[in-house]
């Protein structure tokens, strides 16, 4: 089981591709390694199914907790449903792979990437993407690769290739670029308001490294004596397509030129043309080749009709510069937006509409305990900003069962989440956990960017002090030979019939997120740069329209949102606040009707709908953690009496004891002869023993309050409004 290993080095990091050693019954397999991260990627092909008109490609990313030396925490101690990160990585594999398979291919294909070992310095996702290409080539599957992917980070002014997790967190850019010999085929990035020029430079920098990984794959194939299988389309009967071109081109073209019609009207007219054509074909002679072709496959007419519509729409854009709704290539659809559209029971809400795409976003403010723990191979910090995206069937006028979120919903939600994170306020000044939910009410293209815009409106309506508002736009592309047209703000039909879906989100100062997917085998960086630069005026225009609805975050929170106080205590005193078995902190929460969270670093966050109650809880905690010294004098209240003395609360939550011998200069027979529960007394700290117990005295202490010591009022870190 020796196998063959090819190594390539980037910035001191070595990537190793081992073939011929693992998973011998898979169509093709490769072990991708970098540092201590190991990902096994397999590609398998099986006989296609009858009657389908799409590529049945499945891409899975599997995490095994043993890869990080951990045992699952579930009852069965076994991995269960893939975590969100695994779903996103599976999409990251699928998106650059899918356009490289022949459009006519109908065989079942499955790519499985399994993370077997994880080095905390080396993310596994880009290794899985590159491995998918290598495994597919080794499996002899028709494929227009090789394809490879790398990650680019930005530390200071320097780009870093395949940065570690820590470098990603410290840097201003997290960009993944995938490409083929033909150009870039996929880009995904989160950025800290970077200028367009920096992002374009990063894509170019990454593509150079991609080319090196492509050469490594080609070298492995050559050394193994494997010839890459070139896609060869099956012979197709062109009689039906010729018939449709002759009989339908004029009527379809006329519909596409009716720029004032609605989407529903256009779809209805195209359906009518198709139905009339079907009737005409059905009236042909029984032995007519066109009729026999349609009768043999119920989907062949629909597929050929769509292909002709696509061809005519693309020709109209290339030759006339006209889109189906009459817009110019760089024109944005009509924008309307509103903030505060729901009652304030909902902490914040925003409604964003662009053309026929409409998104309702809501923002909810929560406490630190609402943060999401990341139960995956690289847990990292808890998530304190969550974005959830819902795409119900009625948004496209369809009916289907309502199910749990699929990969698409998870991916769109993650992109919108990524776009907003760079502008969120620092945790120490705004310690709320934030959840935004975007409900797609109507869809006609670019709902993910609509969700970004809706999120901004909802968060500002909720009173979240964003560093800057964020907007987003989706760019498209039509490529016919050397002719290229870039489209601004694509709608559904342009996404479906076009060659690119490029989403760009950001503020007026720069980009915060982008995602590019292709339907062709690659684009030069120069063309991508044109799309990025063309997106900027569209983003700014959309942002200006949004700011007409709300130009700054609200100055006050919803009356139904929790109020938070945040302050710091000595981490060594956390146990004092919590108490044995959590008794002390539970008593404080019950007494003040608040919710209290304490982080390991000593940051205490108190949540309550009543600001006064939160302040009371803060005073108790500060009293518990305040250091007192021998000789200090306090006014306190007798809280309980025992035979040998009395306990006095000298600070909120902090008690000391007066021994019976310290109650008076004279001999005392019974404690309650001198003091009773509820009495106000002035005491001096006589001693603090080695167990931290405070011993008090009344002897020699005047009871007129002159030597009492008052405590300053606490100053909250987070506002109470």
Swiss-Prot record:
Region Disordered: which residues?
700-721
Q: Which residues form the signal peptide?
A: none
Q: Does the keyword Mitochondrion apply?
A: no
In short, the EC number is 2.7.7.8
- What is catalyzed by this enzyme? RNA(n+1) + phosphate = RNA(n) + a ribonucleoside 5'-diphosphate
* UniProt cross-references to InterPro entries, sorted A to Z: ExoRNase_PH_dom1 (IPR001247), ExoRNase_PH_dom2 (IPR015847), ExoRNase_PH_dom2_sf (IPR036345), KH_dom (IPR004087), KH_dom_type_1 (IPR004088), KH_dom_type_1_sf (IPR036612), NA-bd_OB-fold (IPR012340), PNPase (IPR012162)
Return the GO cellular component terms, semicolon-separated.
cytosol
Major localisation: cytoplasm
Q: Which positions in this protein are listed as binding Mg(2+)?
A: 495, 501
Tell me the keywords, alphabetical order.
Cytoplasm, Magnesium, Metal-binding, Nucleotidyltransferase, RNA-binding, Transferase
Against Gene3D superfamilies, the record matches this protein to: GHMP Kinase, N-terminal domain, K Homology domain, type 1, Nucleic acid-binding proteins
Kindly indicate whether the keyword Cytoplasm belongs to this entry: yes
The biological process GO terms on file are: mRNA catabolic process; RNA processing
PANTHER family associated with the record: POLYRIBONUCLEOTIDE NUCLEOTIDYLTRANSFERASE, POLYRIBONUCLEOTIDE NUCLEOTIDYLTRANSFERASE 1, MITOCHONDRIAL
Per the similarity annotation, which family is this?
Belongs to the polyribonucleotide nucleotidyltransferase family.
From the Swiss-Prot or TrEMBL record, give the protein name: Polyribonucleotide nucleotidyltransferase
Question: What is the organism lineage in this UniProt record?
Answer: Bacteria, Bacillati, Cyanobacteriota, Cyanophyceae, Synechococcales
């Amino acid at each position: 089981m020796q196998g063959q290993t090819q190594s390539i080095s980037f910035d001191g990091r070595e990537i190793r591709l081992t073939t011929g050693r693992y998973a011998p019954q898979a169509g093709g397999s490769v072990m991708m390694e970098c540092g201590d991260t190991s990902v096994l990627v397999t590609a398998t092909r099986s006989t296609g199914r009858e009657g389908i008109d799409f590529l049945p490609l499945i891409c899975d990313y599997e995490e095994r907790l043993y890869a990080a030396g951990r045992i699952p925490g579930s009852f069965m101690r076994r991995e269960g449903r893939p975590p969100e990160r695994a779903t996103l990585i599976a999409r990251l594999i699928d998106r650059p792979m899918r356009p490289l398979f022949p459009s006519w291919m109908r065989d079942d294909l499955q790519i499985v990437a399994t993370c077997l070992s994880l080095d905390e310095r080396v993310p596994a996702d880009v290794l899985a993407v590159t491995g998918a290409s290598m495994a597919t080539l080794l499996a002899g599957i028709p494929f227009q690769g090789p394809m490879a992917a790398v990650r680019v980070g930005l530390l200071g002014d320097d780009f870093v290739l395949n940065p570690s997790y820590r470098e990603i967190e410290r840097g201003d850019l997290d960009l993944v670029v995938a490409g083929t010999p033909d150009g870039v085929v996929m880009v995904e990035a989160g950025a800290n308001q970077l200028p367009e020029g920096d992002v374009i430079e990063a894509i170019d920098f990454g593509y150079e490294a991609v080319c090196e990984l492509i050469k490594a794959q080609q070298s492995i194939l050559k050394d193994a004596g494997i010839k890459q299988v070139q896609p060869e389309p099956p012979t197709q009967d062109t009689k039906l397509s010729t018939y449709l071109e002759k009989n339908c081109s004029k009527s379809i073209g006329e519909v596409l030129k009716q720029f004032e019609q609605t989407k529903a009207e256009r779809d209805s007219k195209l359906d009518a043309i198709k139905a009339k054509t079907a009737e005409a074909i059905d009236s042909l002679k029984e032995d007519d080749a066109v009729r026999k072709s349609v009768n043999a496959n119920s989907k062949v007419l629909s597929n050929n009709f769509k292909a002709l519509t696509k061809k005519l729409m693309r020709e109209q854009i290339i030759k006339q510069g006209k889109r189906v709704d009459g817009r110019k290539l760089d024109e944005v659809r009509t924008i309307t937006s509103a903030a505060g559209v729901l009652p304030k029971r909902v902490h914040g809400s925003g409604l964003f509409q662009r053309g026929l795409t409409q998104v309702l976003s809501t923002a909810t403010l929560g406490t630190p305990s609402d943060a999401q723990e990341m139960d995956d191979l690289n847990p990292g910090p808890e998530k304190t900003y969550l974005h959830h995206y819902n795409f119900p069937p009625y948004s496209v006028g369809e009916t289907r069962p309502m199910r749990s979120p699929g990969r698409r919903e998870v991916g769109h939600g993650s992109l919108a989440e990524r776009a907003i994170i760079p502008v969120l306020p620092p945790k120490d000044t705004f310690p709320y956990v934030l959840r935004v939910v975007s409900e797609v009410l109507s869809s006609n293209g670019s709902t993910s960017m609509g969700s970004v815009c809706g999120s901004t409106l909802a968060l500002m309506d909720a009173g979240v002090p964003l560093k800057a508002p964020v907007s987003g736009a989706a760019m498209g592309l039509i490529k016919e030979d050397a002719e290229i047209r870039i489209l601004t703000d694509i709608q559904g039909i342009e996404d479906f019939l076009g060659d690119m879906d490029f989403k760009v989100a950001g503020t007026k100062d720069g980009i915060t997120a982008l995602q590019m997917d292709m339907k062709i085998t690659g684009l030069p960086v120069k063309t991508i740069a044109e799309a990025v630069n063309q997106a900027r005026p569209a983003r700014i225009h959309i942002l200006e329209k949004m700011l007409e609805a709300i130009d700054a975050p609200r100055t006050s929170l919803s009356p139904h949102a929790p109020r938070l106080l945040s302050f710091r205590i000595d981490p060594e005193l956390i146990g004092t606040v919590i108490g044995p078995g959590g008794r002390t902190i539970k008593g404080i929460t019950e007494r003040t009707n608040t919710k209290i969270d304490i982080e390991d670093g000593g940051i205490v966050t108190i949540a309550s709908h009543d600001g006064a109650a939160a302040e009371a809880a803060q005073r108790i905690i500060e009293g518990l953690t305040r250091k007192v010294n021998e000789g200090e004098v306090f006014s306190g209240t007798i809280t309980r009496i025992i035979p040998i003395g009395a306990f006095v609360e000298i600070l909120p939550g902090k008690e000391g004891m007066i021994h019976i011998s310290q109650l008076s200069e004279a001999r005392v027979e019974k404690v309650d002869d001198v003091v009773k529960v509820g009495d106000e007394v002035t005491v001096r700290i006589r001693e603090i023993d080695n167990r931290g117990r405070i011993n008090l005295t009344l002897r020699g202490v005047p009871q007129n309050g002159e030597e009492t010591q008052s405590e300053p009022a606490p100053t909250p870190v987070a506002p109470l409004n």
